[in-house]
């Protein structure tokens, strides 16, 4: 039985981390083997707080060892990683990806390098950003950063579309074959913008921006998951990008229409297989100015 190994956070209530990523990949036809880096009652933006705990790097390694014992690593089609709770967890992920690729050289590694955002800066514990930037992102086949995380990896500021394209080229030169920028903040606030860059070209996706009273959590995890599943279906990066962009819009639209701020992942599940809206991609190049 082939599957996707998904190593990221988990919440019991709502949809963030694995709680946002696992079901969409299953709905798209894939077995998923989740390993949680933390397990919380709910996501951390609830003003009432949350309960739960982080798992150790040894907890991750122990579960991966067990998967290896039953021959699962040879059948692993992809490793998807998101939020890591400690620098040591990043090292356990690095070791896991190495083991999976030794067992199955065709396996993909998709890294969502959760670090922070422009308005918040780096929000992760000491050592995590360094290990993401210097270890996990360079070894990944695909990275799914936001604008802040891309700027950290490319070691340059991003203020314009040209900056973003240049940053993606720098990122591709460091090892990854695909860069999906899950949120490009530097463009117009009238739309929500994403960018895809490969050696074949760079594509901009725009969709309407919803004015939520409280911003939903877990949309980035959803994007990474749907994109990973799309690639494993044999789609080109451009096709997988188009699909995940449209599908994510559908889930956010359902969430907005329901007056909720927890993603309506279950109610809108048909979006994962047949998105209800379509926003054509635009191929972009560096301006001549």
Swiss-Prot record:
Assembly: Homodimer.
Record's keyword terms, sorted: ATP-binding, Kinase, Magnesium, Nucleotide-binding, Transferase
Classification via InterPro entries: PM/HMP-P_kinase-1, PyrdxlKinase, Pyridoxal_kinase_PdxY, Ribokinase-like
Keyword presence, Protein biosynthesis: no
UniProt organism field: Vibrio campbellii (strain ATCC BAA-1116)
Pfam families in alphabetical order: Phos_pyr_kin (PF08543)
Function, in words: Pyridoxal kinase involved in the salvage pathway of pyridoxal 5'-phosphate (PLP). Catalyzes the phosphorylation of pyridoxal to PLP.
Entry's family note: Belongs to the pyridoxine kinase family. PdxY subfamily.
Domain of life: Bacteria
EC class name: transferase
GO cellular component, as recorded: cytosol
Binding sites annotated in the UniProt record for substrate: 9, 44-45, 221
Pathway connected to this protein: Cofactor metabolism; pyridoxal 5'-phosphate salvage; pyridoxal 5'-phosphate from pyridoxal: step 1/1
PANTHER family attached to this UniProt entry: PYRIDOXAL KINASE
Cofactor(s) needed for function: Mg(2+)
Catalytic activity: pyridoxal + ATP = pyridoxal 5'-phosphate + ADP + H(+)
Protein name: Pyridoxal kinase PdxY
